[in-house]
From Swiss-Prot:
Source lineage: Bacteria, Pseudomonadati, Pseudomonadota, Gammaproteobacteria, Enterobacterales
Record-annotated active site: 421 (phosphocysteine intermediate)
Name of the protein in question: PTS system glucose-specific EIICB component
Annotated membrane topology: Multi-pass membrane protein
Domain PTS EIIC type-1 residues, every copy: 1-388
Catalytic activity: N(pros)-phospho-L-histidyl-[protein] + D-glucose(out) = D-glucose 6-phosphate(in) + L-histidyl-[protein]
Intracellular or extracellular location(s): Cell inner membrane
Name of the gene encoding the protein in the UniProt record: ptsG
Length: 479
């Protein structure tokens, strides 16, 4: 039961990556446009602001589409059904909530009762995905043949969404109250504690690939900001981009991603055995550069998480502390994708105490270096380059790596489902005993996580390219 639940949570996390992938362009447009830089003409700034706002204002619908595609192997019919489902469900909700809640009208202070936000999108996407997987091959009488098969899916999704809209009108008001209370607590009443917990838990979930789920309420839901033309923004990311002076509380990520972990990589390099230092130096500095520029940290984290888990526990705690430190020092900056140098520079228009980031970051980097160096030496932790025997294979092309992955996983007949997020392949296999984890690591995987018949292989930013090559090979029956 636990393995099935874990597998489903991984699918949700994987599905969330598609809508999240649109955030960089939306965030950059909104961030630059709303900053009103003097070198950019006013008309261009307005276009950028409106373009970015259009994405953030439609995030629930985008999430509905992403969830539907994630659970139906990217079938376009499920995406259409998700749009239909979300539209019908929200309109049904707007009519039935005043009836079931004994309210003649929804006033300004109660408008949250009608706003299901990202969660509403996830529900609509789940409905359409379930309907698709259940009915996409349905047969109907000949006189209704036009509506059989895939054409039946949007119709059924719409009808089911009316029922869900009525059900939600009863259960959503108390849920909405809880979400509103949590949102106000996290965004305004005690953000220091809220984001400290967020940071630690978010890092703790990374090994399991579930951190994308945990990110959603903090990044997309908490807080509310109305700009000068009446547009409403939810979540720390969108509120910061739109100019909300109370947002930007995700800034702690810059401290441990751009400074802390790169210094940890430096410590592991310095602790490597002399004969391995050259090889480890290249690996660690590549991971450090990736973390600094893009904020993608898995290549560094998975280099020590399995061989020295105590270091990861320390890292998760330090990552969590970075957020309240930034909040207490009133350091604010925005992120659209991950906390890297690109985000840091491009989205600096609405920042506060910008100059403090490198100072605090350098302090944090030295702290990381000292703790990692001490722990590795004191307890003889087998971080990269300190193993008794170590195998490094020559770097291969993406296509060669993809073919080897298929072979190591037991062949294409053993692969049931394949997907990828930013840094890892997410695969479901028929027989997990056919998977050779050691060979995957020798192939260059930073980490391999197995749960039931599910396996995650961390290849860093090349994961999606490898997934594409595997898809191409598996779809070509002549190979």
């Amino acid at each position: 039961m636990f393995k099935n639940a874990f597998s489903n949570l991984q699918k949700i996390g994987r599905s969330l990556m598609l809508p999240v992938s649109v955030l960089p362009i939306a965030g950059i447009l909104l961030g630059i446009g709303s900053a009103n830089f003097k070198i950019i003409p006013h008309t261009i700034s307005n276009i950028m602001t409106e373009a970015g706002s259009s994405v953030f204002s439609n995030m629930p619908l985008i999430f509905a589409i992403g969830i539907a595609l994630g659970f139906t192997k990217n079938d376009g019919v499920s995406a259409l059904a998700a749009v239909v489902s979300y539209g019908i469900m929200t309109k049904t909700l707007s009519i039935t909530i005043p009836i079931f809640s004994n309210l003649s009208d929804i006033n300004v202070n109660q408008k949250y009762l009608l706003d299901t936000g990202i969660l509403g999108g996830i529900i609509a996407g789940s409905i359409s995905a379930y309907i698709f997987n259940t009915f996409y091959r349905i047969q109907l009488p000949e006189y209704l043949g036009f509506f059989a098969g895939r054409r039946f899916v949007p119709i059924a999704s719409g009808l089911i969404s009316i029922i869900f809209g009525c059900i939600l009108s009863i259960i959503w008001p108390p849920i909405g109250n809880v979400i509103k209370t949590f949102s106000e607590w996290a965004a305004y009443q005690n953000p220091t504690l809220a984001f400290g917990i967020y940071g630690t838990v978010e890092r703790a979930l990374v090994p399991f690939g579930l951190h994308h789920i945990w990110n959603v309420p903090f990044q997309m839901q908490i807080g509310e900001y109305n700009n000068s033309i009446g547009q409403i923004f939810h979540g720390d990311i969108a509120r910061y981009m739109a100019g909300d002076s109370t947002a930007g509380k995700l800034s702690g990520g810059f401290i441990f991603k751009m400074y802390g972990l790169p210094f940890a990589a430096l410590a592991m390099w310095h602790c490597a055995n002399k004969k391995n230092k050259a090889k480890i130096g290249g690996i660690m500095m590549s991971g450090a550069l990736t973390a600094i520029l893009t904020g993608i940290t898995e290549p560094i984290e998975f280099s020590f998480i399995l061989v020295a888990p105590i270091l990861y526990v320390i890292h998760a705690i330090l990552a969590g502390l970075a957020f309240p430190i930034c909040i207490l020092l009133n350091m604010r900056s925005g992120t659209s994708f991950s906390h890297g140098l690109i985000d840091f520079i491009v989205l600096s228009g609405n920042s506060n105490n910008f100059w403090l980031f490198p100072i605090v970051g350098l302090f944090y980097g030295i702290l990381y270096y000292g703790i990692f160096y001490f722990m590795i030496k004191k307890f003889n932790l087998k971080t990269p380059g300190r193993e008794k025997s170590i195998t490094y294979i020559n770097q291969k092309t993406i296509k060669e790596t993809a073919l080897l992955v298929i072979s190591i996983l037991g062949g294409k007949t053993n692969i049931i489902n394949l997907d990828a997020c930013i840094t890892r392949l997410r695969i479901t296999v028929l027989d997990i005993s056919k998977v050779n984890q050691k060979k995957l690591k020798n192939l260059g995987a930073s980490g391999v996580i197995v749960s039931g018949s599910g396996i995650q292989i961390v290849f860093g930013t090349q994961s999606d390219h490898i997934k594409t090559e595997i898809d191409n090979y598996m779809s070509n029956t002549n190979q």
